[in-house]
């Protein structure tokens, strides 16, 4: 059995009407836990930290959409694991950066890497998220991509640059 806690602004009456038991509020949850895996939308995690985590002594791991400043360490489980030990707040790299660093870090440990050039061709939106409106076009972001900058933050000895191309699809990524 799992307990369900509601975030601020959730309609508790709707849960009650559907006979879904609610254990409490998000603040009440924060009083009960030692660590929070915060995957809320970008910007909400830092608000949760200020409003709840610091108040109740809750350690937190934030998803890639948050600003790096939310955490003690910008964290990747392979490339800088040791830096995250005994820290209160970690911010994870984005999904693309996570995969990229896994590859670069493994190659770096085996043969040494000084420079990387990255190309990411990715969907413009997640499945079910169609609000971006890109149709029959490719959109290229300015170099270097945040993935290249993030890689250099985690692995400062590697010089990285990269381009990112958004495609008008909702499935799939190509990282080279």
Predicted regions and their residues:
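N-terminal Rossmann-like NAD(P) cofactor-binding subdomain of oxidoreductases
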Residues: 1-125
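Active-site-lining helix/loop region of Rossmann-like oxidoreductase modules
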Residues: 104-176
